[in-house]
Amino acid sequence: MKEIIGIYGTAASHWVGDGFPVRSLLYYGDLREHISPFLLLDNAGPAQFAPTDKRRGVGTHPHRGFETVTIVYAGEVAHADSAGNSGVIGAGDVQWMTAARGILHQEYHSEAFARQGGTLHMAQLWVNLPAKDKMSAPRYQAIVNADIPRITLPDEAGTLRVIAGEYQATHGAAKTYSPVNVWDLQLNADKEVYLQSPATHTTLLVVLQGNV
């Protein structure tokens, strides 16, 4: 059993652009080595949006030296960047963008989602790059839900998706520079689960919905 260093509550909400109402659940400036190599985790939504023809989101902006991992739970997000990558990710999909030596990108609600309206919920995790990899070429991984390994937990406790790293010899879909495990866990009500992680790893448990 690992020592619990701290339990942190929900931060105040703020807007990123005009499309993402965000709560920053983790921030490197406060926790530093306790969450390395992770820098930040934002939880956007769940939020309701009315149908519109207007583009909602964040215009072109730069990133450098780290990776952004966007996990969509509801709605659709469209991405485009200066390396020529573009695409739409929907519920269950993951976008893993490596900014490395530098990239410009933009994120908006997809055109179809904007016109239809509905619930948007996503999380975005920032992962620091090792010093030796910070000047690597930018990279973009669009990972659809069907390509993410899914494990059924014992006693009908729920499911675990292995986005990156591995869990019980099941390897995740994303290619990473740092040895990290990113698991997306859906735990059913009144159930419990015991998860093993490497003794040398810092472990973060982030509750996006519900209570533990």
Map each language-model feature to its residues.
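Short, Gly/Pro- and small/polar-rich lid/capping loops
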Residues: 1-12
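A short glycine-rich, His/Asp/Glu-containing loop-to-beta-strand
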Residues: 14-73, 151-194
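Short helix/loop capping segments that flank catalytic or ligand/cofactor-binding pockets
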Residues: 34-35, 48-50, 80-81, 106-107, ...
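Glycine- and acidic-residue-biased ligand/ion/polar-headgroup-sensing regions
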Residues: 64-84, 90-94, 100-104, 189-191, ...
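"Short basic amphipathic alpha-helical interaction patches in structured regions
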Residues: 83-90, 109-112, 139-142
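Ligand-binding loop in jelly-roll beta-barrel domains
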Residues: 99-132
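Short, structured patches in soluble enzyme cores that scaffold and shape functional sites
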Residues: 124-131, 144, 162-166, 186-189, ...
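Long amphipathic alpha-helical segments that form oligomerization/scaffold cores
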Residues: 127-160
